[in-house]
């Protein structure tokens, strides 16, 4: 009996360890080789056909912004590849007639991998697929960093008043990039508080939101981040109460 119990415990621990390894392995960045060379080569051809006239054959930018270098990376880093892919798929090429023949989603995906290659991110063994876009984060060559100034972010903290009419989030979490349309999720309700503080601007941009009704509540704030020493702030696009108690 004891041998059976020990064997069962060993199998359980092995399963848990494997599951944890799979979970950690699913969190990737573009530094991990998330596309293949063959995929990027296809993307080169599609890019030349659909994008080169505006963005330049070397992604240097002509009538449209460059798709390589620090300016491009700063705009998108610390976010998943999904929003970048959707931006390209839904809006590019700019000015394309509505009745034009649709560009296959796979071509857009290959173009994205070519952009990654030109920006210096190494290829791997497997192709990038659409179901992986939400699990791969675009980062600079120095790895994960705090989100940049101007990014649309989400943070969780306690709503407090300061001065006569100012409002802020105290004990706030480190901001993370988020699409503007995302709403609160059960996981955000359970988010542990942090140590940061952000002033809140443009409260009037949030429909039907009265800050005095949510004082000392645990809130999720979304908006555009301004990095400024001792005066970091978020220009709000959304506010949502997560818990009436901020503990």
In which residue ranges do the predicted regions lie?
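The canonical Cys-X-X-Cys-His
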Residues: 43-57, 111, 115
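Electrostatic cytochrome c docking/interface patches
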Residues: 21-46, 140-149
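Conserved RNA-binding domains used in RNP assembly and mRNA/RNA metabolism
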Residues: 108, 112, 128-247
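Positively charged n-region of N-terminal signal peptides that target proteins for export
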Residues: 1-4
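Gly/Gly-Pro-rich "capping" loops immediately C-terminal to redox-active cysteine motifs
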Residues: 33-40, 58-89, 170-192
